[in-house]
Amino acid sequence: EAPVGFTPPELDPSTPSPIFGGSTGGLLR
């Protein structure tokens, strides 16, 4: 289940996600 702020690193790994605390790729990998 992907949360509302779920953003794959393929789109923009530099985009700070409020849910991941600004670390998108770190949580997915």
UniProtKB/Swiss-Prot annotation:
The keyword Membrane applies. It is found in: Plastid, Chloroplast thylakoid membrane. One of its GO terms (cellular component) is photosystem I reaction center. InterPro entries: PsaD. Its main location: plastid. Keywords: Chloroplast, Membrane, Photosynthesis, Photosystem I, Plastid, Thylakoid. GO terms for biological process: photosynthesis. Residues 1-29 are annotated as: Disordered. It is a peripheral membrane protein. It comes from the Eukaryota. Belongs to the PsaD family. PsaD can form complexes with ferredoxin and ferredoxin-oxidoreductase in photosystem I (PS I) reaction center. PSAD may encode the ferredoxin-docking protein. PANTHER family: PHOTOSYSTEM I REACTION CENTER SUBUNIT II, CHLOROPLASTIC, PHOTOSYSTEM I REACTION CENTER SUBUNIT II-1, CHLOROPLASTIC-RELATED. This is Photosystem I reaction center subunit II. It comes from Populus euphratica (Euphrates poplar).
